[in-house]
């Protein structure tokens, strides 16, 4: 019996689930069902990304505790997957203690290996994307595009991952197919993005005086982990990576690598095609242990009254 490990992106429960969330989960569920019918041993992992600045901001706006917000909205996602008959085998929630332990263990190892360093930063920051920006992120008109949302100026000290050290390897992995990317035409998009990775390291922390809702750095308690660094690790933390023998999680060595990370085109670059493979390599994963990225597009909703189309990401579902 062949194993088949399929994941989806974990959803951000700062709001209600929408058609984009549903499309991705149903797509992954169809693939998982097909593989089960073929006789494969399937492990289908999905879940929620409960940390980060947007969660903290939404909780503040609603006047509720952020943990309460995370629990309340997570229930909405679970209820929808039950309603749609999505049959997953593993559930990832980033506030789970086993995930926290795994993330902190990885951070400690990378810190000990010299893959993380601390430096001061002064520049621009996208609140929507929760990431720092460079001049290359400006449009031809000299402004930051709408995709970045609110952009503010920041000056603060943070911890960084030596992403740039892995850029040449990443280019080779994408070109050779060691990092699988489907459909094939998405590969060119990734290769174009690697140039920036060769020049910029990844900020993997946020100071607690600005963001308290996250996983604390084990070697510097004044900081929490950047939400993407935290979230990406769910693909291995809930698949048994670094778990003890008494754990009910799968056998990681048998399960990994993932046969399909099902993700939207908006989070291919930089998160899944730049950050994630470089993180894996820094952890000691080899070329033949890299996952396959299965990238889907978006739904457009046609308005009956105007005939115009808009992104379906705001079409709420219940």
Where in the sequence are the language-model features?
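Structured secondary-structure scaffolds
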Residues: 2-39, 43-46, 98-102, 147-318
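Anion (oxyanion) recognition and catalysis
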Residues: 36, 82, 111
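Short, charge-patterned binding micro-sites
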Residues: 48-54
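A charged helix-plus-loop insertion that forms the helical arch/lid used to bind
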Residues: 58-71
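A glycine-rich helix N-cap at a beta->alpha junction
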Residues: 73-89
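Feature captures the FAD/FMN-dependent oxidoreductase FAD-binding
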Residues: 95-115, 125
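Cys/His-rich short segments
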Residues: 113-171
């Amino acid at each position: 019996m062949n194993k088949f490990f399929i994941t989806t992106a974990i959803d951000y429960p700062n709001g209600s689930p929408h058609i984009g969330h549903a499309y991705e989960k149903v797509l992954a569920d169809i693939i998982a069902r097909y593989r089960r019918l073929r006789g494969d041993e399937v492990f289908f992992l999905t879940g929620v990304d409960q940390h980060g600045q947007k969660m903290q901001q939404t909780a503040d706006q609603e006047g509720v505790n952020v943990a309460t917000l995370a629990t309340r909205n997570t229930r909405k996602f679970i209820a929808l997957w039950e309603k749609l008959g999505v049959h997953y085998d593993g559930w990832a929630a980033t506030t789970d203690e086993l995930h926290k332990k795994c993330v902190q263990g990885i951070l400690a190892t990378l810190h000990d290996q010299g893959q993380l360093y601390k430096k001061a930063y002064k520049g621009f920051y996208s609140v929507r994307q929760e990431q720092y920006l460079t001049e290359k992120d400006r449009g031809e008109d000299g402004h930051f595009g709408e995709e970045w949302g609110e952009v503010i100026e920041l000056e603060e000290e943070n911890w960084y991952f030596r992403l740039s050290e892995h850029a040449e390897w990443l280019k080779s992995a994408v070109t050779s197919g060691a990092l699988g990317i489907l459909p094939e035409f998405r590969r060119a998009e990734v290769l174009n993005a690697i140039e920036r990775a060769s020049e910029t390291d990844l900020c993997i922390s946020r100071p607690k005086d600005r963001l308290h809702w996250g996983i604390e750095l084990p070697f510097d308690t004044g900081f929490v982990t950047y939400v993407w660094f935290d979230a990406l690790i769910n693909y291995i933390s809930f698949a048994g990576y670094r778990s003890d023998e008494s754990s009910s999680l799968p056998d990681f060595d048998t399960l990994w690598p993932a046969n399909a990370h099902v993700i939207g085109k908006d989070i291919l670059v930089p998160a899944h095609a730049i950050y994630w493979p470089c993180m894996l390599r820094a952890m000691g994963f080899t070329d033949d242990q890299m996952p396959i990225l299965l990238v889907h597009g978006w739904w457009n909703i046609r308005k009956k009254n105007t005939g115009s189309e808009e992104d379906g990401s705001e079409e709420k579902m219940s």
